[in-house]
């Protein structure tokens, strides 16, 4: 997909970001932090890129819990990823948060795969994969740097020509540096998988703008370390609702 082909999608995405400017945050990163959104908040995530687009919704139905569904559409035809789509469903539980609310630990588990983790059999992997990981956030240098680590594991059923069950270790790490204050961050991450389902390691770098606790926009570039099927240029925005999705009333 050429960069110029992104223009209609970018215009739509930016219009949505402006229209809902209050509650916005960008999220095209493979890494995640420990944080669960406040109880009752619904989240809409939109990302457009050269390799794939993403539409994701998250509902914080219980305190410290998130329930997420995501859909990915693909433009690349390499690595067995024809133009098509895959889905992902998962839950996240925030286990621990420090007193300053700048770091903690969570657990995530679900099914489906995002583009950067697809192995040799492409979309066939995504619909047969179950996974778990542990997001960990560590604040450094007086909160000038935030370090996210997310080790995990996955199991893919009916993998390959023999239809065996295949396992993999997944890894993601991300650093966000705030050189001039909390509004602007330089972000970089590395992610991939090793084992019976192996993906080429990728890196992603970009800028993240955080004008308030409710608004963040990010522009990034993604590529493989030893390949040619990286995500390319991406722009993403995350839109938050006021608390409303509560079974027993929102406080």
Tell what function each PLM region has:
Residues 1-2, 24-25:
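Short alpha-helix boundary/capping segments
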Residues 2-12:
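Bacterial N-terminal signal peptides that target proteins for export
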Residues 6, 15, 134-138:
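A broadly conserved amphipathic alpha-helix scaffold signal in soluble, globular proteins
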Residues 11-21:
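Bacterial N-terminal signal peptides
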Residues 26-251:
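Transmembrane beta-barrel domains of Gram-negative outer membranes and organellar outer membranes
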């Amino acid at each position: 997909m050429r960069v110029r082909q992104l223009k209609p999608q970018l215009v739509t995405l930016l219009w949505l970001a402006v229209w809902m400017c209050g509650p916005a945050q960008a999220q095209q990163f493979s890494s995640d932090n420990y944080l669960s959104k406040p109880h009752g908040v619904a989240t809409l995530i939109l990302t457009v890129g050269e390799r794939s687009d993403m539409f994701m919704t998250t509902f914080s139905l219980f305190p410290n819990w998130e329930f997420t569904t995501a859909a990915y559409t693909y433009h690349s035809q390499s690595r067995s990823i024809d133009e098509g789509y895959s889905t992902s469903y998962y839950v996240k539980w925030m286990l621990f948060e420090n007193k300053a609310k700048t770091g903690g630990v969570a657990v995530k588990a679900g099914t489906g795969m995002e583009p950067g983790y697809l192995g040799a059999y492409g979309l066939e992997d995504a619909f047969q994969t179950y996974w778990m990981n542990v997001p960990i956030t560590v604040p450094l240098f007086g909160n000038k740097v935030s370090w996210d680590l997310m080790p995990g594991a996955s199991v893919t059923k009916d993998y390959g020509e023999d239809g065996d069950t295949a396992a993999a270790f997944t890894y993601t790490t991300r650093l966000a540096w705030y050189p001039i204050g909390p509004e602007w961050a330089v972000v970089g991450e590395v992610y991939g998988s090793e084992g019976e389902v192996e993906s080429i390691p990728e890196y992603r770098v970009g800028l993240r703008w955080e004008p308030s606790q409710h608004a963040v926009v990010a522009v990034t570039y993604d590529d493989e370390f030893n390949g040619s099927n990286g995500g390319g240029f991406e722009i993403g925005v995350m839109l938050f609702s006021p608390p409303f999705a509560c079974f027993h009333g929102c406080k």
